[in-house]
Amino acid sequence: MEFDVTIEIPKGNRNKYEIDHETGRIRLDRMLFTSTRYPDDYGFIDETLGEDGDPLDALVLLEEPTFPGCVIRCRALGMFRMRDEKGGDDKVLCVPASDQRASWRTEIDDVSEFHRLEIQHFFEVYKDLEPGKSVEGAHWVGRDEAEEEIRQSFQREADRIAREGH
């Protein structure tokens, strides 16, 4: 299964950018309150709707950071299941579909345990100092479960468009 991911935040940033889905412009939402930095390029899977009412989040494993607004054709390795103050807030872990350096990665276990712990630690603490924000229930699941969530998120977005007419 392949899909497009739009990057909002490059690896190593503390600035939290968001794409305004009405205008397409990139907005600085805030600087993270903690000293943590995004462990990988971070964005969303296009044409999806996650359980939190936003597009389904994604992390893309790359050798070099990209830039906000960059679109990458990806495939899933697994997913980090978590909840925040708005409900389900899963993060799909991906690699670029055409990157030969990543062709051997097909499952979550192909990502080192240490790197998975880095990602987990980031998402467990990155909202710690922000009033009214919380994170809970974080754990990793494999590619099959990630792909099922992606399919459900595509369907949620299609249903939303059918209901609202746009």
Model-derived segments and spans:
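Hydrophobic N-terminal alpha-helices or hydrophobic patches in metabolic proteins across all domains
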Residues: M1-H166
